[in-house]
Curated annotation (Swiss-Prot):
UniProt keyword list: Ribonucleoprotein, Ribosomal protein, RNA-binding, rRNA-binding
SUPFAM superfamilies documented for this protein: Prokaryotic type KH domain (KH-domain type II) (SSF54814), Ribosomal protein S3 C-terminal domain (SSF54821)
Gene responsible for this protein: rpsC
PROSITE patterns: KH_TYPE_2, RIBOSOMAL_S3
One Pfam family cited in the UniProt record for this chain: Ribosomal_S3_C
Any Gene Ontology biological process: translation
Domain KH type-2: 39-108
Organism from which the protein derives: Persephonella marina (strain DSM 14350 / EX-H1)
Function description: Binds the lower part of the 30S subunit head. Binds mRNA in the 70S ribosome, positioning it for translation.
GO molecular function: mRNA binding; rRNA binding; structural constituent of ribosome
Name this protein carries in UniProt: Small ribosomal subunit protein uS3
Gene3D superfamilies (alphabetical): 3.30.300.20, Ribosomal protein S3, C-terminal domain
InterPro entries linked: KH_dom (IPR004087), KH_dom-like_a/b (IPR015946), KH_dom_type_2 (IPR004044), KH_sf_prok-type (IPR009019), Ribosomal_S3_C_sf (IPR036419), Ribosomal_uS3_bac-typ (IPR005704), Ribosomal_uS3_C (IPR001351), Ribosomal_uS3_CS (IPR018280)
Subunit structure: Part of the 30S ribosomal subunit. Forms a tight complex with proteins S10 and S14.
Length: 227
């Protein structure tokens, strides 16, 4: 049988970066890891309406830097930054760190973020929208936004049937075994009348290393023209 590998974990250090950036000894490692889980869970639950795409945590001694990527950053920031200040105080208590800084960035194309797409499909399923309609709409939006490929899968008691099954739709390419391929992956859960439905989304945005090569070549050409 074929073995499945997590698309992001498979590409760490090549086209993907770590979401927690810190080092710790064996005694503190478990504690800091649990803190990271608490921070992410708290932010995602508190700002459900903001469309939280990612929470990146950096630690350096007693300093903690938290970067929140959201499709609606205004909800997290609040009026004149009041919400961010309140969030700073709460997270300082959670982490027991002396210096906590929260930065909020906007996700410019939420249609190309796998986690946000999966959550949007899950929300539609909870509102009793047809799963096929929700999946096809997400695929159309992603392809229009510039995706090179997208795969969407829904699993569970779809439509309330007795036997659980999986259904998926795909458009474009999805080179899962190509490490240089920039593939985003996200999951979500939909709580329906008949039980939990699982949603998985893969979005292929192109080859990252190829883009880097093009940028280097352009710079070389520009330098040659200036000489």
């Amino acid at each position: 049988m074929g073995q499945k590998v997590h698309p992001i974990g498979f590409r760490l250090g090549v086209t993907k970066d770590w979401k927690s950036k810190w080092f710790a000894d064996k005694k503190k490692y478990g504690q800091l890891l649990h803190e990271d889980v608490k921070i992410r869970k708290f932010v995602e639950e508190r700002y459900k309406q903001a469309g939280i795409a990612d929470v990146i945590i950096e630690r350096l001694g007693e300093k903690v830097r938290i970067k929140i990527l959201a499709s609606k950053p205004g909800i997290v920031i609040g009026r004149k930054g009041a919400e961010v200040e309140e969030l700073n105080k709460v997270l300082q208590a959670v982490t027991n760190a002396k210096d906590v800084t929260v930065n909020v960035d906007e996700v410019k194309k939420p249609e190309l973020n796998a986690k946000l797409v999966a959550e949007d499909i899950a929300l539609q399923l909870e509102r009793r929208v047809s799963h096929r309609r929700a999946m096809k709409r997400a695929i159309d939006n992603a392809m229009k936004a510039g995706a090179k490929g997208i795969k969407v899968q829904v699993g569970g008691r779809i439509g309330g049937v007795d036997l659980a099954r999986k259904e998926w739709f795909m458009a474009g390419r999805m080179p899962l075994q190509t490490i240089r391929a920039d593939i985003d992956y996200g999951t979500a859960r939909a709580s329906t009348k008949y039980g939990i439905l699982g949603v998985k989304v893969w979005i292929y945005k192109g080859d990252k290393l190829a883009e880097q090569k093009e940028e280097v070549l352009k710079k070389i050409e520009e330098e040659l023209h200036t000489v």
